[in-house]
């Protein structure tokens, strides 16, 4: 009876997720890429038309690979768009059902083991859908869209499909045959993809930890020393990709002053650029550098204006969140480098053949997080007299932690996009801002019909589709699916043993990797990302100091 109720809940929630994704989310997820913007006041030079981003043609006039389908195969554009919209909605529905099945298994862990049609039919079917969506369908359309963006004038639709299939096959083969770390524990392609998600999340965690700690430390250090804003070290902070963190602690007056300085610099550089364009033998290298500098100013103006528009309450909340995040980063950094990494090195030296980490698990003296929190609450507040009360509390905390981790994995999609976009060089930031704009679906080819009501409906549909970027929507969907799978692997290490075992039985032997292997891999990638990020920051600062680059 419980399985039937769960199935009804899965069906209703899945239908709701599909409907919301189809009618609303499809039009909203592209806004996650609005990390960068140009100034609304001083957009005095058209960046996309002046800078060479991608191909030499104007990015706004690029063709659409969907139109090529129509030209070559007479396949109506609106049907292709409709299919991609259905694929996106189906993917979101599948992710929702996956999360609910995992949470249900955590909830019923510890009860009498019972095989239901959800574990024997619904979950395997869900896993198959995840495989096709994440490994074949979405990557195919992402790759073909990107190829069309850069090679629109060189590739017809047949060549686009052939090259896309070759690239996709290469990526799948690479994912199948890579044999390092936890990848050697499984041959299941979906599991390997989820391990890739764990790797990306660990890398982003290391990047965020070091960059946040480093730049916030510099800001606080210079504030205590009363360093003037014109100091070169302050200019290095402002030139960095983390200048939004430093600006969070400044006053509105300083931000307005920076806006005026940037606007003045834009006007000066534009005058120089126009004088260069009038010359016969213009210096193309100097012109390109000047264009990049103007582009940087315009992007920074967009950030400053957005910061000024925020209310004091939002600024205060962001400051409080930043302080909490700094404390967490310090804790994570200390635990990883002083406890986890030394023990991993010790284990690899003492037990070089212990590939299953049997000795590691015996010597590791840390309880799952759910048990630790339950014991703290029991000691501090509840003082339970019976073990089953403590077990019940542990299970509730396990469920809460799992829900929190899945919510965090969804927010990690936004974090990934923001860090990747802001870390790109200026030229590629302009590409992300303009070349991935809404030209993907703007040119829906018309269809002839005598039905006037259908004409009106079709016109409205075309208007709705304007403003939608296929690349953005599919990238967000792919990242979400990969992170959901990665969280499914990582969540087990925070759960009690019987809950973790129940989850392992649901996922199946082909889908699971030992908890300790995933945890150790995450720590190793995190530590490497921390060191690599710090080295890159120092190299970038030295490069800025050597070239005496100034934004004043």
From Swiss-Prot:
GO terms for cellular component: membrane. Keywords: Membrane, Transmembrane, Transmembrane helix. It comes from the Eukaryota. It is a multi-pass membrane protein. It is found in: Membrane. Pfam families: ABA_GPCR, GPHR_N. InterPro entries: ABA_GPCR_dom, Golgi_pH-regulator_cons_dom, GPHR/GTG. The chain crosses the membrane at residues 127-147, 160-180, 393-413, 517-537. This is Uncharacterized protein YHR078W.
